[in-house]
């Protein structure tokens, strides 16, 4: 019997609530014209899902299944599917985690029609915390052969966000460039590190955990700093780690916000780039005058286009990159165990992706 996992309504103000998870019995969907029916095998959590439970993310829906990231097997084709989709029958695929962004490198072609799926309006039937999902045939990509379903589910949101931040927005995805990734441990930060290493960049990372920094070095980081134990001077410590022939950062990829601009100024080159894909510290970011005088370029970013998604999957397939999995639980009906994954996000415990094996 198919299930969906949604949020259960509860009266409270945004930021003062934590909606419980609710398991629902549903009917198996049928694929419409040019749609493929996928039996989902794994789904992954993102920070946005934690924000949704606190009513801190726009468009919250109590009808829509949770989670944006999923991987499964194509089990049925709707009428009118192309020859390419016919070849996907019985194959494992990963799904795009958004709708309404085709190929424009500057952003969605029509912002009013863009949204990330999972737990939000208007896509009441789209979300990866369910047994079956029917989507347009253009919204899937063949799972790279070297990945399993758990690793495939870990890719969509963090993969496309990291790809766009590093490749499209930073302009520094080149051999020998010095890149800082802040807050290593989350999915986007780790995936950015993996992409940068594969591209020949000198990747530096920061964290408040020495254990996470050690793991990052194992993944290819050439330098690490602890912004908790070295809170007053981690920027100077980082500067001492940079190569003599290129003693500055070319770009910073940041998901925290806060005072990152101020701290990065001492090591960022004139005209350097800071790419911001999130603000977990708070919704406001410092912007000192020194940043303007140094011609620092601050660029916001979010997920990416279908075209970038295809590029990302192809790169992962070519370079045999595997996402890092922090922890998995088995069973969509194991609500208490799934709540434990959300607790890992709340405490910052995870290193890599948190995945439900459906």
Swiss-Prot record:
The answer to whether keyword DNA-binding applies is no
The EC category is: oxidoreductase
Keyword Transmembrane helix, does the record have it?
Answer: no
Question: What keywords sit in the KW lines?
Answer: Oxidoreductase
Provide the E.C. number(s) assigned to this enzyme.
1.-.-.-
Which ranges form a coiled coil?
Answer: none
Q: In which pathway does it act?
A: Secondary metabolite biosynthesis
Function of the protein: Zinc-type alcohol dehydrogenase-like protein; part of the gene cluster that mediates the biosynthesis of phomenoic acid, a long chain aliphatic carboxylic acid that does not appear to be essential for pathogenicity but may play a role in allowing to outcompete other fungi in the environmental niche via its antifungal properties. The polyketide synthase produces the long methylated aliphatic carboxylic acid chain of phomenoic acid. The cluster-specific cytochrome P450 monooxygenase may then hydroxylate the methyl group of carbon 31.
Of which family is this protein a member?
Belongs to the zinc-containing alcohol dehydrogenase family. Quinone oxidoreductase subfamily.
* Name the UniProt record assigns to this protein: Zinc-type alcohol dehydrogenase-like protein YogA
């Amino acid at each position: 019997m198919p299930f969906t996992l949604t949020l259960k309504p509860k009266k409270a103000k945004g930021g003062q609530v934590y909606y419980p998870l609710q398991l629902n019995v549903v009917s198996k969907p049928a694929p419409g014209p040019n749609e493929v029916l996928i039996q989902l095998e794994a789904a992954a959590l993102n920070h946005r899902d934690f924000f949704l439970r606190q009513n801190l993310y726009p468009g919250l829906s109590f009808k829509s299944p949770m989670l944006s990231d999923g991987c499964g097997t194509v089990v049925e084709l709707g009428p009118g599917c192309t020859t390419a989709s016919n070849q996907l029958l019985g194959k494992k695929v990963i799904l795009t985690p958004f709708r309404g962004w085709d190929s424009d490198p500057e952003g969605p072609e029509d912002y009013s029609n863009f949204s990330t799926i999972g737990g939000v309006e208007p896509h009441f039937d789209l979300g990866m915390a369910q047994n079956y999902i029917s989507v347009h045939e253009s919204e899937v990509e063949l799972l790279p052969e070297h990945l399993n379903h758990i690793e495939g589910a870990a890719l969509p949101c963090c993969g496309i966000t990291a790809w766009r931040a590093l490749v499209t927005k930073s302009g520094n995805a080149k051999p020998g460039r010095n890149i800082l990734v802040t807050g290593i441990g989350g999915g986007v930060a780790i995936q950015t590190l993996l992409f940068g290493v594969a591209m020949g960049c000198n990747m530096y990372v920061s964290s408040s955990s020495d254990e996470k920094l050690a793991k990052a070095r194992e993944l290819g980081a050439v330098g690490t700093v602890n912004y908790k134990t070295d809170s007053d001077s981690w920027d100077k410590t980082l500067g001492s780690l940079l190569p003599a022939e290129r003693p500055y950062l070319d770009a910073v990829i940041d998901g925290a916000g806060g005072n990152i601009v101020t701290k990065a100024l001492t090591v960022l080159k004139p005209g350097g780039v800071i790419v911001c894909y999130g603000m977990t510290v708070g919704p406001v970011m410092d912007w000192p005058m020194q940043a303007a005088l140094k011609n620092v370029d601050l660029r916001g970013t979010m997920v990416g286009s279908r075209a970038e998604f295809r590029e990302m999957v192809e790169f992962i397939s070519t370079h045999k990159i595997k996402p890092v999995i922090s922890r998995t639980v088995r069973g969509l009906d194991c609500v208490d165990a799934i709540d434990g994954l959300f607790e890992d996000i709340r405490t910052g415990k995870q290193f890599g992706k948190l995945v439900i094996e459906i």
